[in-house]
């Protein structure tokens, strides 16, 4: 693998992880804030809100994991080599 392809792969992997973390990070913060606000308004619904929050956080975190998988593929199983 030449140095240009190697450098481009490292840059693409860094962008994949970085950009894949921005959206879910903002979404998780917003969802957690809304959940806290909802629990403060209706404390009796805390269990249902928390369950829904944890499920939605898991789905959001999956997007970041997909970005990590793309980065690992670019670094270790480079399709451009």
Curated annotation (Swiss-Prot):
It is a multi-pass membrane protein. F(1)F(0) ATP synthase produces ATP from ADP in the presence of a proton or sodium gradient. F-type ATPases consist of two structural domains, F(1) containing the extramembraneous catalytic core and F(0) containing the membrane proton channel, linked together by a central stalk and a peripheral stalk. During catalysis, ATP synthesis in the catalytic domain of F(1) is coupled via a rotary mechanism of the central stalk subunits to proton translocation. Key component of the F(0) channel; it plays a direct role in translocation across the membrane. A homomeric c-ring of between 10-14 subunits forms the central stalk rotor element with the F(1) delta and epsilon subunits. Pfam families: ATP-synt_C (PF00137). The keyword Ion transport applies. CDD domains: ATP-synt_Fo_c_ATPH. It comes from the Bacteria. GO terms for molecular function: lipid binding; proton-transporting ATP synthase activity, rotational mechanism. GO terms for cellular component: plasma membrane-derived thylakoid membrane; proton-transporting ATP synthase complex; proton-transporting two-sector ATPase complex, proton-transporting domain. It comes from Synechococcus elongatus (strain ATCC 33912 / PCC 7942 / FACHB-805). F-type ATPases have 2 components, F(1) - the catalytic core - and F(0) - the membrane proton channel. F(1) has five subunits: alpha(3), beta(3), gamma(1), delta(1), epsilon(1). F(0) has four main subunits: a(1), b(1), b'(1) and c(10-14). The alpha and beta chains form an alternating ring which encloses part of the gamma chain. F(1) is attached to F(0) by a central stalk formed by the gamma and epsilon chains, while a peripheral stalk is formed by the delta, b and b' chains. Belongs to the ATPase C chain family. InterPro entries: ATP_synth_csu_bac/chlpt (IPR005953), ATP_synth_F0_csu (IPR000454), ATP_synth_F0_csu_DDCD_BS (IPR020537), ATP_synth_F0_csu_sf (IPR038662), ATPase_proteolipid_c-like_dom (IPR002379), F/V-ATP_Csub_sf (IPR035921). Keywords: ATP synthesis, CF(0), Hydrogen ion transport, Ion transport, Lipid-binding, Membrane, Thylakoid, Transmembrane, Transmembrane helix, Transport. This is ATP synthase subunit c. It is found in: Cellular thylakoid membrane. Disulfide bonds: none annotated.
């Amino acid at each position: 693998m030449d140095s240009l392809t190697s450098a481009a792969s490292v840059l693409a992997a860094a962008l994949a992880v970085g950009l894949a973390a921005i959206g879910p990070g903002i979404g998780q913060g917003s969802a957690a804030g809304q959940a806290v606000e909802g629990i403060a308004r209706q404390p009796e619904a805390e269990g249902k809100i928390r369950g829904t929050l944890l499920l939605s956080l898991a789905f959001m975190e999956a997007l970041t994991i997909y970005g990590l998988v793309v980065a690992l593929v670019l670094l270790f199983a480079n399709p451009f080599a």
